[in-house]
């Protein structure tokens, strides 16, 4: 049986900033971006307020790779309807903050934003989404390209190589019974906290070694257990909140049923208006009669 490792989001905050552990993040980035990635340095997090990060269950890390590109890796556990806007803000902030005043625009760094989401972000059937920026002609349908001189000056092959790039990994909906490639092995780890014996994706063997719960110091173990407890409380709160909302919706529908029934609306019409079955409607009416006695 695969041994349990510490959660990746906590590891990003506490363990993976250590240069000795760069190999774990380098492995993940190399698999995702399909190229060999070497981390030059870990820059300051998008937010230095650790307690706020824990409170809102948002953990991020900002990496500069050997090509001078900025990579934002963010783990998000809670649902936020404006999360797409937040991703845009993060890349924009990194773009502006990491160019020196007075320098030419050509020195703007490429930003790659990677989100590992444990909730169903947006609507879509896939669990990995990739977004790039292209300019397509509205009449001829061609893709606007860099000139040969621009390619030479900026060492870029495509316009999209200049603009921010977005990756969204919906780990929460990943089917752990269907691991088909090395990226799936990483997503399996994100979701389950386990690395199977036959997994060979770069970085995972090192993750299995360096993120072993048994190797935590007493202080690290205490911090980790507190982090996991916060996750449990947050999940419990969300579950309770959802149940309360469902109860409220159920009561509102029952009130509508009784109001229509008292107005002598036929049961089939009530069913049509409320999307309830006739059996459910009759049960609501019966409950109302019992309360009125």
Predicted features, each with a name:
Residues 71-76, 181-293:
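Short, charged alpha-helical interaction segments and adjacent helix-coil junctions
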Residues 1-221:
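Conserved single-residue anchors adjacent to enzymatic active/cofactor-binding motifs
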